[in-house]
Design a protein with these regions (language model features):
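N-terminal single-pass transmembrane signal-anchor helix
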Residues: 2-38, 43-53
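Membrane-proximal N-terminal amphipathic helix
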Residues: 41-72
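Short, glycine/small-hydrophobic-rich surface segments
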Residues: 64-106
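Intrinsically disordered, low-complexity regions enriched in Pro/Ser/Thr/Gly and acidic residues
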Residues: 95-231
Length: 231
């Protein structure tokens, strides 16, 4: 075997080994890029869904304020709908007072964006006093219950809260004990002004908090609220 052929074979072997190394590096790079891509997509989807939840809540607030402007009292506002829990009543009762009624607020009854909670519908309460909003009375709020922790933290970050400080609704042991009330707390005209649920001011890095996602210590759930009517 000539020296030239030996050199050629040696060069081929070097190229083969170099190709294997480069292929391995490319595989690692693509894998890392793929992981980052999925993460970016998930983050983008979360941002879009958080924005959709805020938009839906803002539309409800607009409907409530339209009814108030048209002379409906805050105690006469109703949130009945065929797909809503029965405690909210019948949408055909006093139709001009119904937030979702065609003769009332004309709001669209929407399901939460998919994947951000356990599928529970929007709820409506007058049992929580929101920090630095209105007076010392309870506000009328919409609540998106049982959202995921990741959605909650993402929502609060998007709203400008300190990411190291989770807004919290501490437990007092008495009812109401969370922005997400019980079935008996569903709004049908009565506000809990005498003994409202009060949030933990020290955990809110941004005030007033007309909307936020809070951790409820009473049942270890995360719930997003939006003030429909400050009082």
């Amino acid at each position: 075997m000539t020296t030239q052929r030996i050199k050629e074979r040696g060069s081929i072997l070097v190229y083969i080994l170099l190709g294997v190394v480069l292929l391995g590096l490319l595989t690692i790079a693509l894998r890392n890029a793929g992981t980052g891509g999925v993460s970016d997509i998930d983050k983008e989807q979360m941002i879009l869904k958080a924005g959709q939840a805020q938009k839906d809540a803002a539309e409800l607030a607009a409907a409530v304020n339209d009814l108030i402007a048209n002379g409906v009292s805050e105690a006469d506002l109703r949130f009945a709908h065929p797909d809503a829990p029965t405690e909210y009543g019948n949408i055909t009762d006093n139709p001009t007072n119904q937030v979702f009624g065609k003769q009332g607020g004309k709001a669209t009854y929407k399901s939460p964006p998919e994947g951000i909670n356990d599928g529970s519908p929007w709820e409506f309460f007058g049992s929580s006093q929101i920090i630095q909003v209105g007076s010392d009375r309870s506000e009328l709020i919409a609540v998106l219950p049982n959202v995921t922790e990741s959605f909650c933290k993402g929502m609060d970050a998007q709203l400008g809260f300190d990411p190291t400080l989770q807004p919290t609704d501490n437990s007092t042991g008495s009812s109401p004990d969370c922005v997400m009330g019980t079935s008996s707390d569903r709004f049908t005209g009565t506000f809990s002004d005498a003994s409202p649920n009060v949030l933990d001011k020290a955990t809110f890095s941004k005030l007033p908090a007309l909307q936020a996602c809070v951790y409820c210590a009473a049942d270890s759930t995360y719930n997003y609220y939006y003030v429909l009517l400050a009082r």
